[in-house]
Amino acid sequence: MKQQEVRQRAFAMPLTSPAFPPGPYRFVNREYMIITYRTDPAAIEAVLPEPLQMAEPVVRYEFIRMPDSTGFGDYSESGQVIPVTFRGERGSYTLAMFLDDQPPLAGGRELWGFPKKAGKPRLEVHQDTLVGSLDFGPVRIATGTMGYKYEALDRSALLASLAEPNFLLKIIPHVDGSPRICELVRYHTTDVAIKGAWSAPGSLELHPHALAPVAALPVLEVLSARHFVCDLTLDLGTVVFDYLRQ
């Protein structure tokens, strides 16, 4: 294979059979359960990279079912998101995500910089209860519950929150182990169509794990529980801060 062909075909590894396809990345019937809780502000400050700033001492714990996604297929995901501000702009910082599908795991890390690891998340309805769980290996590290479709949510407020920017810390090492890329990335979700949205009483339980430390942001008080289904497009990102050029 000629050098020019290598350059033209270079998108993802392996060169001749990339682990994930090019976008756009459209998600249909994407289902969320989000438990928002109050936590220790010092715990957030210990994991939040500058120049992001904590908006408030809360965390959104997410369980997500994605049954129909372009190129990525059918999978589930779970993790923690922190409300932040960046130079006066309000948004969200994804601290950690766990999922059960290789293409979005590789694509999420390599393209955007999502902090993804392999895990076993689930989001299921058990009679009148929506139940989310996350196992890391044989260990259950998160369990969330909420009533099933108790009260309709304000869709305009939900759409506004989904339109806010999201921030990621993308880190890729050089071949000698030194940092090659260390960037703050901003991305948006677009073309959002909400198909249903509800609130209900909710609960969240987190358990310590050495390699999946979701419990490092402890649950002090559950503030809200939201369940919604939507279609959306996951746009590619832009670099807003380069740590290696400062």
From Swiss-Prot:
Q: Which family does it belong to?
A: Belongs to the ADC family.
- What is annotated about its quaternary structure and interactions? Homododecamer.
Does this entry carry the keyword Lyase? yes
Which organism encodes this protein?
A: Chromobacterium violaceum (strain ATCC 12472 / DSM 30191 / JCM 1249 / CCUG 213 / NBRC 12614 / NCIMB 9131 / NCTC 9757 / MK)
What are the cysteine partners in each disulfide bond? none
Q: Which domain of life is it from?
A: Bacteria
Q: Which residues form a coiled coil?
A: none
Q: What class of enzyme is it?
A: lyase
Keyword vocabulary terms for this entry? Decarboxylase, Lyase, Schiff base
Role played: Catalyzes the conversion of acetoacetate to acetone and carbon dioxide.
Give the gene name. adc
Which residues make up the annotated site Important for activity? 117
| Catalytic activity from the UniProt record | acetoacetate + H(+) = acetone + CO2
Per its record, how is this protein called by name?
Acetoacetate decarboxylase
Give a GO molecular function annotation for the protein: acetoacetate decarboxylase activity
What does UniProt list as catalytic? 116 (schiff-base intermediate with acetoacetate)
EC no. given is 4.1.1.4
